[in-house]
Amino acid sequence: MFSEQELAFLRAQPLARIATVDNEEQPTVDAVGFEFDGARFSIGGHQLETTRQYQNSVAGHCKVSLLIDDLKSLRPWQPRGIRIHGIAEIVHRQGHLGPGSSLAITPRVSWSWGMEEPGTEPAKVGPRKIIWQ
């Protein structure tokens, strides 16, 4: 459901930030690597099972927020990004370094900004919201 501009942006980004909540309802944000397969985001990594985002998901806190952003330009100021609210689940899959666990994030709602066609004024366009099925 992402546009071609959004997909190209996702492919070019090496990092995302994931927000989860712990048992005390304390939000926490961590930088993570990610992959997007067209339907779900995968978060993996070395010793994933020891990370806060993994432990929070194991504890049943499956609602997450994922942010992928950058600055296209400082002058003029041109921030761009994609924010996803979704559901995380732990999956076991074959990764780059062999079998292991990962967090699979299924988007429920996403917003993007700064992905406008050249010549389009961002202030008039506003964030693009997608409700995922």
PLM region descriptions:
Residues 11-13, 26-27, 81, 96-98:
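Short solvent-exposed loop/turn micro-motifs enriched in small/polar/acidic residues
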